[in-house]
């Protein structure tokens, strides 16, 4: 397994990889952007590091490290990542090559497989964000139970809930 730089010849692969995601895996968008908008996004260099994952001379996924030290690893659906071994190697390589004081992973709480992966690799849950849709949006912490219940009773619905995990080095 090795990590390689992204070039324009990889745009289609990255778009296809994004297209594979199920709704519960996403936290950044509610619907798939157009191909052209995705190319603009890639060209904007939104992350500190954004690399492709190559295994046995085949590109199988991507990984990024954001400017806020957030890590996200995406592997194509057809690839059997037995017991998360590829994902673990990628995580270890990112942490080794791009040393930071701490790292984060933002995960949709319904994505149990990935939550368990990060927990097994030393990440700890330290923050939850709730997004409410209704008359107004407000970020709530998971311990704001009374506020959450108040909003639910008054016509709001939880549109998104994100767990943030961190790993300190």
Where are these regions (language model features)?
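Hydrophobic alpha-helical core bundles mediating ligand binding, dimerization, or RNAP-core interactions
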Residues: 14-19, 38, 42
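Conserved acetyl-CoA-binding loop of GNAT-fold acetyltransferases
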Residues: 119-129, 152-161
């Amino acid at each position: 397994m090795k990590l390689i730089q992204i070039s324009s010849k990889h745009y289609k692969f990255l778009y296809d990889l994004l297209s594979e995601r199920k709704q519960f895996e996403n936290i950044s968008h509610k619907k798939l952007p157009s191909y052209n908008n995705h190319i603009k996004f890639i060209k904007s260099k939104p992350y500190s590091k954004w690399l492709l994952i190559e295994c046995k001379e085949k590109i199988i996924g991507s990984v990024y490290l954001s400017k806020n030290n957030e890590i996200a690893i995406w592997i194509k659906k057809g690839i059997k990542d037995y017991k998360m071994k590829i994902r673990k190697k990628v995580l270890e390589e990112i942490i080794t090559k791009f040393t930071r004081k701490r790292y984060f992973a933002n995960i949709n709480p319904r994505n149990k497989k990935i939550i368990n992966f990060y927990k097994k690799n030393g990440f700890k849950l330290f923050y939850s964000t709730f997004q409410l849709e209704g008359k107004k949006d407000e970020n709530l912490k998971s311990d704001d139970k009374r506020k959450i219940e108040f909003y639910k009773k008054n016509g709001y619905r939880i549109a998104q809930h994100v767990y943030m995990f961190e790993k300190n080095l």
